[in-house]
């Protein structure tokens, strides 16, 4: 993934100092795989220290590789750094397939109320397009979203506006 996406650094996030068997194995495998990609800088970090550092210096990180439990926690922390769950897409990319989805889940408590921010869903589709080799289409979607948010006219409630889900989506479509 890091090579294909032009990334420069991968950090394995673990708790191998305590979880010696499971996270120790994860870290050993990460280090072995890293040897196959000498052009990519590889580091590892204990999850709690990395979370503190990520908040203080997010620019130090590029790709974080985590076991599922830590990945779930770290991804929510990262969502907070960029404005919240409503803005955050996710990609789970494996050897033989990939899944793209909003990080926030289905939000059943506000289903049908037309007030959910669709940005994470739209950006997840953009990530999928990029993964499928449609970089221009992905970039166009990202630019449209950036433009709509920057203008501030069609923002959903979580971004301080009054626009409905559909109004925000329509504004993005209009930019495309």
Where are these regions (language model features)?
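Glycine-rich phosphate/pyrophosphate-binding loop and the adjoining helix
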Residues: 1-5, 10, 16-19, 135, ...
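Hydrophobic alpha-helical scaffolding
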Residues: 16-20, 40-44, 63-64, 115, ...
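Conserved structured core elements
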Residues: 24, 44-48, 119, 135, ...
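Glycine-rich phosphate/diphosphate-binding loop of Rossmann-like nucleotide-binding domains
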Residues: 1-48
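Glycine-rich phosphate/nucleotide-binding loop
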Residues: 53-153
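Short glycine/threonine-rich loop-to-helix capping motif typified by GTGT followed
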Residues: 20-29, 55-62, 79, 153-155, ...
């Amino acid at each position: 993934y890091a090579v294909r996406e032009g990334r420069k650094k991968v950090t394995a996030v673990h708790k191998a100092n305590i979880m010696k068997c499971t996270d120790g194995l994860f870290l050993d495998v990460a280090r072995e795989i890293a040897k196959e990609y000498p052009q990519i800088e590889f580091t590892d970090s204990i999850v709690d220290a990395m979370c503190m550092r990520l908040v203080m210096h997010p620019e130090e990180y590029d790709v974080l590789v985590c076991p599922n439990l830590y990945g779930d926690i770290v991804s929510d922390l990262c969502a907070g750094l960029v404005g919240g769950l409503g803005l955050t897409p996710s990609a789970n990319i494996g050897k033989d397939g990939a899944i793209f989805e909003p990080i926030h889940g289905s939000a059943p408590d506000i289903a049908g109320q037309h007030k959910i921010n669709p940005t994470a869903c739209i950006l997840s589709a953009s990530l999928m397009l990029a993964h499928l080799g449609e970089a221009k289409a992905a970039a166009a979607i990202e630019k449209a979203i950036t433009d709509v948010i920057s203008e501030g006219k069609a923002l959903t409630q979580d971004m301080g506006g009054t626009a409905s889900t559909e109004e925000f989506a329509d504004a993005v479509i209009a930019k495309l």
